[in-house]
């Protein structure tokens, strides 16, 4: 078990501990539960779906990287597939505050990058900020997405974001988590192809500036992130943050990164290179390359 989980794990009920122990074994638990695992945990612990999600929230929050605020937020995105995806907030010392990943963004991008097609609910241990409410409004689940908070009745995103502005106001039909493939040809080595594949998945209906990042760890593991734009622009999630989020959730550290590649168009309206390189260098990675999409 990764050390970050030990305190939260020790506070769980005994029957839930017994069921979770084999799942959490090893240093690189993927911070997700399959539908089958969720069903097993519910039956073993005698909890319904909502109660189980609340019980597991401390494990999600334990994944937070909060060197600046020391305020850990955890979230669990519940996919329509039945799979659950952990998320937690991330802050990057030496970068800028704008590079921060919020817990809801973390869980949602985690689900998206693992191929989830839609979300039924998000469980989070603190009220979503306005930034995250706007980010969630880009999803194909729309304002019907259920939000669950401790000590409160569940509400929909519509309740938390009245009179919402979103992609439909801009006549955008393809939403975040809808299937997208922009068709750029895969070239280069494995890591380069992974970055291009991530760029092909980008949600970028506002700038038409696709981008993807691939990070290679010293043990050969590769994590990718795809660009996810938002109708309100500022809640947009850059591709590097998506990749760093997956890397961290899987129990890796920034020091494990040995190489990074950004794939983007050289003549795009928005360019990720400078911000991507600056953030990676702040985290200690200097082996950074760029491949241009054509």
UniProtKB/Swiss-Prot annotation:
Catalytic activity annotated for this protein? cytidine + H2O + H(+) = uridine + NH4(+); 2'-deoxycytidine + H2O + H(+) = 2'-deoxyuridine + NH4(+)
Needs which cofactor? Answer: Zn(2+)
**Gene Ontology process terms (BP):** cytidine deamination
Q: Which UniProt keywords apply?
A: Hydrolase, Metal-binding, Zinc
UniProt superkingdom: Bacteria
Q: Name one GO molecular function term.
A: identical protein binding
Q: What is its EC number?
A: 3.5.4.5
Q: Where is the active site?
A: 104
How are cofactors bound according to the entry's free-text note?
Binds 1 zinc ion.
Q: Which residues are Zn(2+)-binding? A: 102, 129, 132
The UniProt record gives the binding positions of substrate as 89-91
Ranges for domain CMP/dCMP-type deaminase come to 48-168, 186-294
The record's listing under InterPro entries reads: APOBEC/CMP_deaminase_Zn-bd, CMP_dCMP_dom, Cyd/dCyd_deaminase_Zn-bd, Cyt/Deoxycyt_deaminase, Cyt_deam_dimer, Cytidine_deaminase-like, Cytidine_deaminase_bacteria
Q: Does the keyword Zinc apply?
A: yes
Q: Name one GO cellular component term.
A: cytosol
Q: Does the keyword Hydrolase apply?
A: yes
Q: What class of enzyme is it?
A: hydrolase
For this protein, the record's PANTHER family field holds: CYTIDINE DEAMINASE
> What does the annotation say about its assembly with partners?
Homodimer.
Q: What does this protein do?
A: This enzyme scavenges exogenous and endogenous cytidine and 2'-deoxycytidine for UMP synthesis.
Q: Which family does it belong to?
A: Belongs to the cytidine and deoxycytidylate deaminase family.
The record ties this protein, via NCBIfam families, to:
cyt_deam_dimer, PRK09027.1
Q: What is this protein called?
A: Cytidine deaminase
According to the entry, what is the taxonomic lineage of the organism?
Bacteria, Pseudomonadati, Pseudomonadota, Gammaproteobacteria, Enterobacterales
**Gene transcribed to yield this protein:** cdd
